[in-house]
Amino acid sequence: GKTSLLRLLCGENIPHTGTVACGSRLQISHVQQDPSGLRGDLSAYAAQHGLDESLFKAILRKLDFARVQFEKDMADFSAGQKKKVLLARSLCEPSHLLVWDEPLNYVDVLSRIQLEELLLEFQPTIVFVEHDRVFCDRVATKAVTL
């Protein structure tokens, strides 16, 4: 249910009833629950997604990414490291709205705190599904409980 709602917000054509309307120029950056499937190095990934590579890597550093990881193949990353790549990408992408599905899945406690600090610093408009009440209370300005 919650994931389907986020997918509809992102414009995916999935079976539903009712109407979902988003502005035609609305730019959304979506992070899915599952971080698998990432391959290649971070520089190529940044280029592929049109990201400012230095900003992208700076955000990864703020998420406790070691510099040695920058040269490795993402296929060898842990699920938590892959999730950080997706979150950093989303924070770098030009968008009006971030839509994140369980951003803390696979992320260790220290990185949760660092992500919280990044969100408080960047203050993006974000819709997210998350089960960690403390995180939600600290970063959300409004909440809908489903």
Place the predicted regions along the sequence by residue:
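ABC ATP-binding cassette signature C-motif
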Residues: 1-146
